[in-house]
Amino acid sequence: MNGSQQICFTDSAGKALFSIPENGLLCLFYGNGDRHFAVCHRLDDTHAEIDGVNYSLPDFAKRMKHNQISFAPA
């Protein structure tokens, strides 16, 4: 896999928010003030492994919104 490939994160409606590089870090912000850093691996244009779990990127955003967790590049 090309090391310059990007993972494009979207909101729950599928609108592009930001990109991080393959093997980049995502910061998750919880409502109680906790933060968690997750390593991300690109699977294809719309899927990534985030902290060891495979996600469709729009589904990941929906899950984070439902759980009131915000996310941003680390």
What is the meaning of each model-derived region?
Residues 1, 7, 24-26, 38, ...:
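Generic low-polarity alpha-helical segments
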Residues 1-17:
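Mixed-charge, Lys/Arg-rich low-complexity intrinsically disordered regions
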Residues 20-54, 58-60:
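Acidic, low-complexity, intrinsically disordered interaction modules
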Residues 53-74:
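Intrinsically disordered, low-complexity, charged/polar segments
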